[in-house]
């Protein structure tokens, strides 16, 4: 891998990976040569699908992306900043839809910087029409749809 490549990781529980994530990924690819989508644990969330299921679903969602620029990894036991260091990524991609997300991301960014001083967190803001998309809402909608069946 070239030393000049701008490498980023885009971590998330991705349960599920949705159009909002895809939108942020597209924006990240305008800035970076390689983006690792890292399926990881979020201690603040209860996931509904296994790592393997999420990896398969995510890989199917990104079939139209250049495989040399987007790769999917599973992280079960390392901190995000440690994964970035192992992969040679100098950037962590995150997104914030509102002030609550922003405050949360601010704390995460500071923690990641303390663990890995070489990493910078890049917040990519969604376009206006994508602001309301989130995984929890999608899971709740699916749950309600299943109740109606």
From Swiss-Prot:
GO molecular function, one term: pantetheine-phosphate adenylyltransferase activity
Subcellular localization, as worded in the UniProt entry: Cytoplasm
UniProt keyword Glycosyltransferase, yes or no: no
Entry-linked InterPro entries: Cyt_trans-like, PPAT, Rossmann-like_a/b/a_fold
BP-aspect Gene Ontology terms: coenzyme A biosynthetic process
EC numbers for this chain: 2.7.7.3
The organism's place on the tree of life at top rank: Bacteria
Substrates-to-products reaction catalysed: (R)-4'-phosphopantetheine + ATP + H(+) = 3'-dephospho-CoA + diphosphate
Cofactor(s) named in the record: Mg(2+)
Main location: cytoplasm
Keywords recorded for this protein, A-Z: ATP-binding, Coenzyme A biosynthesis, Cytoplasm, Magnesium, Nucleotide-binding, Nucleotidyltransferase, Transferase
GO terms for cellular component: cytoplasm
Pfam families, sorted: CTP_transf_like
Site feature (Transition state stabilizer) residues: 21
Binding site for substrate: 13, 45, 80, 94
The protein's enzyme class: transferase
Pathway as given in its UniProt record: Cofactor biosynthesis; coenzyme A biosynthesis; CoA from (R)-pantothenate: step 4/5
Positions annotated to bind ATP: 13-14, 21, 105, 130-136
Complex and partners: Homohexamer.
Family: Belongs to the bacterial CoaD family.
Role, per record: Reversibly transfers an adenylyl group from ATP to 4'-phosphopantetheine, yielding dephospho-CoA (dPCoA) and pyrophosphate.
Listed name of the protein: Phosphopantetheine adenylyltransferase
Name of the gene: coaD
